[in-house]
Amino acid sequence: MSVSIKPLEDRIVVRPLEAEQTTASGLVIPDSAQEKPQEGEVVAIGPGRFDDNGNRVPVDVAVGDVVIYSKYGGTEVKTGGNEYLVLSARDVLAIVVK
């Protein structure tokens, strides 16, 4: 998937994954009652930030990784009819290993 957003420094562009629409017992959860997703697929990464010595520190995730991120982190962006979240690398809590 090609994204028209090029993140800077240690920023990451994530496509949020859809939240479950039903409960385990089969009840449908309306959009107004659903929590924001905290899991998404990385679609673009920045080159990394510079440390105090001027060395570039690479980002720990790669394009295609599924990550769990901070609930209130990032900035929501819409482009090309799709919704994305631009996060700082510090807002990523974990990589989901399947």
UniProtKB/Swiss-Prot annotation:
GO BP annotations, alphabetical order = chaperone cofactor-dependent protein refolding
Family to which the UniProt record says this protein belongs: Belongs to the GroES chaperonin family.
A GO term, aspect molecular function: metal ion binding
Does Cytoplasm count among this protein's keywords? Answer: yes
Q: Which InterPro entries match?
A: Chaperonin_GroES, Chaperonin_GroES_sf, Chaprnonin_Cpn10_CS, GroES-like_sf
Signal peptide location:
none
| Function recorded in the entry | Together with the chaperonin GroEL, plays an essential role in assisting protein folding. The GroEL-GroES system forms a nano-cage that allows encapsulation of the non-native substrate proteins and provides a physical environment optimized to promote and accelerate protein folding. GroES binds to the apical surface of the GroEL ring, thereby capping the opening of the GroEL channel.
From the Swiss-Prot or TrEMBL record, state where the protein is found: Cytoplasm
Does ATP-binding show up as a keyword for this record? no
The UniProt keywords, alphabetically, are: Chaperone, Cytoplasm
| Alphabetical list of HAMAP family matching this protein | CH10 (MF_00580)
What gene is behind this protein? groES
Q: Name one Pfam family in it.
A: Cpn10
UniProt-recorded name of the protein: Co-chaperonin GroES
Q: Which species is listed as the source?
A: Paenarthrobacter aurescens (strain TC1)
